[in-house]
Amino acid sequence: MDLAQPSQPVDELELSVLERQPEENTPLNGADKVFPSLDEEVPPAEANKESPWSSCNKNVVGRCKLWMIITSIFLGVITVIIIGLCLAAVTYVDEDENEILELSSNKTFFIMLKIPEECVAEEELPHLLTERLTDVYSTSPSLGRYFTSVEIVDFSGENATVTYDLQFGVPSDDENFMKYMMSEELVLGILLQDFRDQNIPGCESLGLDPTSLLLYE
């Protein structure tokens, strides 16, 4: 029997590292192309553009920037306007209010009030009415400048009426003034409106009925 011959040793494969040849680094079109690294940030295109507000941050005088100067001017104008309005309101003079009138004549009105039955026994009522009439006409925007005095002329418990004498100072020989400012409708209307706005304590129904007041010269 033939003995098996030993197998030939297998040749070991040698692995060699392939190195890039210099000519392989050259691109086909002949132009070198540089690829940015991942760690490098590509600046945005807008970064090269100047902001339209950048001029406001420029120093004009020392450390004062342009926006500071504009804001100061704006606030200064507003302050001047406010001060001017305040001074105008304080120094305003109403020519009509301060006009000195020559009230050389007197105008007399008699006003009679009918007292409700529940108020006849009120002893202080005539005094309260005197104070009320004085306050009404002395503080009236229309007649306050001309009002002089008010006095009780007659008080009748039986007829439940009280009559007052109203005195006003008026310019002489002024028909328009007497027609519009000292008309009976105006003098009586002021008192009626006051009774509607505020009643007499203890006699709430007094003056609410227009027929309970009579004005005559």
Swiss-Prot record:
Induction: Up-regulated following treatment with 12-O-tetradecanoylphorbol-13-acetate (TPA) in the pancreatic cancer cell line HPAF-II. The up-regulation by TPA is triggered at the promoter level. Residues 1-37 are annotated as: Disordered. Keywords: Cell membrane, Disease variant, Endoplasmic reticulum, Hypotrichosis, Membrane, Transmembrane, Transmembrane helix. GO terms for cellular component: endoplasmic reticulum; plasma membrane. Its main location: endoplasmic reticulum. It is a single-pass type I membrane protein. The keyword Transmembrane applies. It is linked to Hypotrichosis 15: A form of hypotrichosis, a condition characterized by the presence of less than the normal amount of hair and abnormal hair follicles and shafts, which are thin and atrophic. The extent of scalp and body hair involvement can be very variable, within as well as between families. HYPT15 is an autosomal recessive form characterized by sparse to absent scalp and body hair. Eyebrows and eyelashes may be sparse or absent as well. Interacts with LIPH. This is TPA-induced transmembrane protein. It comes from Homo sapiens (Human). The gene is TTMP.
